[in-house]
Amino acid sequence: MDNSTCSSEQEDAANRCRWFRINWKWCKMGSYRLGINIRLNPVVSLVSALIIWGFVAWCIIKPETVNSTMAEWKTWIPTTFTWMYIRAQDAWAGFIIYLYFSKYGNMKLGKPDEKPEFKDATYFTMLFGAGTGISLFYFGVAEPVWHYAPGFYEKRHYNRYTDNQRAQDSINLTLFHWGIHEWIVYVVVGLLLAFVGYRQGLPMTMRSCMYPLIGDKIYGWIGDAIDIISVVCTMFGVCTSLVLGVMQLNAGVHRLESSVEVSTFNQIIIVWCVMACAIVSINSGLKLGIRRLSETCFALGVFIMMLVFFFDAPCYSLNLLVQSTGYYMQTIVQRGIHTDAFAQLGNAPDRKEATGWMDAWTISYWGWWIARTPFVSMFIAKISRGRTIRQFIIATFAAPVAFSILWFSVFGGAGLQMERKAALANITCDSALGRTNASESLNGLFRPSCRDENGMWFDVMSQYGDMGSFLSALSLISIALYFVTSSDSGSLVIDCLSANGDPKPPVLQRVFWALTEGATATALLYVGGNEALNALQTVSIASGAPYTIILCFMSKALWKAVKVEAGDLDPNGPQFTTGLLDVLSTPTVESVCKVIISIFAPWYSMGTAAGMVEKQNGRMWTHMLIMALPFYACISMLVLERLCVFSGICYVGYTLLFGFFAYATGVRNSIREKYEINGNIAEDFFAVMVLYPFAAYQMEHHMKNHKPTNHIQNGHCLPESCRIPLGEMEKLMDPDARKTDV
């Protein structure tokens, strides 16, 4: 069916296709009255709520244990997975750039004749407000200053160049963190979600992103797992931004009214005050509430930026803008692949290294961006209908990056200028004026690097004479409004995820998730205290790690989706006779037994398949022997290492195990090539290494049952199993007709 024939009625009905599990089967879900109107996926909603509220309870009951555990995570994850974070970001960026210039760039996210729902200016303000608005106020001044002067994690570079070069490098590092590598994760997922949602009629939920790869299995436990992870990641990603905003709000209010102390208690009060405003905003919906708030926030931010631009030194800001843009483009590849490999070892003979810099900055940011991906991407997808792929990439990739460069050139430049002026005036962290806790400046100057990060923004605003208080007050209003916008958008996205993509979930459910956001932010503040920023960084890194793997699969899904839609890939072409995870979704006694046997003897099924590929049963046992020897040798060596019989022998075992994976990859690759199954050797290696029992069963099953099958459905509209008959659509659209008394 051509996508142009999908009627608007079908698409509206598809958006309201909801499911719940009864006896391991999926059924359509309507609205239920339990004294109130609710529409949700109970599996996703309950499990997600239990995980999040369990974390909140853990933070409140055992804050010391949470702190120590977070410290361990913060060390272990970057040490182990820095390479994965760095490489994945670069790969996604390269993929999106290639997609932009490909022939698929003109494909529209919707019907061919559809127009964009929002004007470009409104669209930009909405996606920017959901993306990074509130965080730019927090880091606009602070991050360049931190990179310029020795901070908590020291400087990345030590005495390598002049002070001017050091200042420029601080801007370069800041732009690296807030540029292409931030927005690339939102582009990949947002584009995929909009594509499958508006062109193929799938529900607007993260599980739909995997439909091009696993078909109808997204409506089973795999889809539940994806949505649960997405809800949890979204909650922690949004709360990171909210807590940063709260800490800055507290510092700003204290600056204007000294009787209001900077304390965790006051910050918690601010959380719930602003959360109350967000709950009120929830009733206004997307087009009125979030749209108008986003436009107001963006306008206020631009107004403040222009005032600072003219108040400070316009020529200096313009010079810095042009210069920083050039340096950013010049060094983006070099910085994008830098992992601080030597610095993380912490053994430099000259001691000129910052061992904690990478995990405190780049990896923390990458984890934060990835954790926010479900939230920002789904929100962007919701407002992107009617745009082409190329228009989408430009709007969500180039425009926000350009604005971020402008923002940091103005505010970061102002902060660096104050820092350098204070240094020339001999203001140090021990000075009576301008020092860490000073309430008064020295001739309008503070030393930002000596000050609390929450108040650096207001230190810079205060230097503009009589306008300082006005700018500070205006900044507080902007931060508070961005807080409301982020909370409102976050609760909307989380509610959609927990309701199987329902575009208009009940308000009460959004209120529940807004309250959950407030509770999570409160827990992070309570645990972190004065070190709340460390707690936030740890949560971001930890929640972003598992989603990095999911994002890699989503990139593959996006590429497959556009190729199928363009007719360059036959979705009904040759496939493996069974999917890797079919045994979990549709288990049989035979398949379960085969997988269990393959856990301990994968060589048997793999060797059988290898012999059948070559049609030489005599070589079957040769293949089995070649794979069995390294597999069992690895296990034996791990046992010897554990028993302290032979120190270091486990590494020999790991090497042999890698050889087993490589050989098994060759077997799976030969099966694919023989039967012309779509894929590549990298996918084969990943399948064998991560899911070797399932891969072994899949290979043997295919060789014994290799009749052509249409294993994965890829219709342009919603699959038949999920479509709502047009005759029932009016009932679904009528709230009274959908309600059932329980």
Stretches with model-predicted labels:
Residues 218-480, 502, 526-532:
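Membrane-embedded translocation segments of transport machinery
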Residues 32-37, 63-78, 99-116, 169-177, ...:
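Membrane-water interface regions at transmembrane-helix termini and the short interhelical loops
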Residues 16, 36, 51-59, 93, ...:
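Helix-loop-helix module between adjacent transmembrane segments
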Residues 16-23, 47-61, 86-94, 161-162, ...:
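Transmembrane alpha-helical segments of multi-pass small-molecule transport proteins
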Residues 2-166, 556-561:
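N-terminal alpha-helical transmembrane segments of multi-pass membrane transport
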